[in-house]
Amino acid sequence: MYHRLGTLSGRIDSGERHVWGKKKCALAAVLVTVLYGAAVTAVFSWVYQMNDDRFMKEVLSGVYNGTPDAHVIFIKYPFALLIRELYMLLPGWDWYGIVMAGINLLCLALILYRCLRIWETWKGKCFFLAMVMAGYTAAWLLRMLAFTYTTVAAMAGAAALFWYGSGSRQAKGESAGSAAVTVVLAWLSYLLRDSVFYMLMPFAAVLFLNRIALLGEQDRKQTVKQLVLPVVLFLLVGLSRMLDRAAYGSQEWERILADADAR
């Protein structure tokens, strides 16, 4: 089995190398994602899977209260506030659905971009692009089209894990921008559904410890630098939690939240 996998890897790596720059990889990833999104939209319909998502949309858009409101209970207040501002700026658009679909497609584009950056041969790029698209379609197309905030949070968290884990191949030279992508995706997962974020943390811890092990004891400076990412992430999580608690700090909201938890 290992011999066959090694043979396959050798075949993929063989051939003329085409090292693309960041702009070309980003353009290719965005183009594939846009074409994929347009194709599935032309063939299928996007639907709200859960009543909770429909409820949040109506609150954010102002249908429920008469004016757009960010108190949607299920997702953290700072992110809900951002969506509410979109409804205030351009009413009449389904911004909740657009944002949820956009996050799914953004995660796909980032995964494609990372694959294009890692693999240098045409065969490698084409093979793994095909693998990613086939795997995404088989495992996630239904979840993407019939979306809910929980599955979108899971997609953001999974993309963060992939981005961080694949970045360990060049841990010493990873840019601040690459680390920022990991932080933003993981933070987004928390803002959408904190329980999903917490479930992903053990896997993130394993990847973190693996990266530390790859650096070794001799490179203590780089080891200390690896602590910046989790520190920044949990500062953002802590700040978001404080803002969320402040938004729901009244006794009336505490009672409503208790009823929601009991449900």
Where are these regions (language model features)?
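Transmembrane-helix motifs of polytopic, lipid-linked glycan transferases
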Residues: 102-120
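Juxtamembrane membrane-water interface segments immediately following transmembrane helices
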Residues: 198, 222-263
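Extracytoplasmic catalytic/substrate-binding loops of multi-pass membrane glycan-assembly enzymes
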Residues: 41-60, 68-81, 90-94
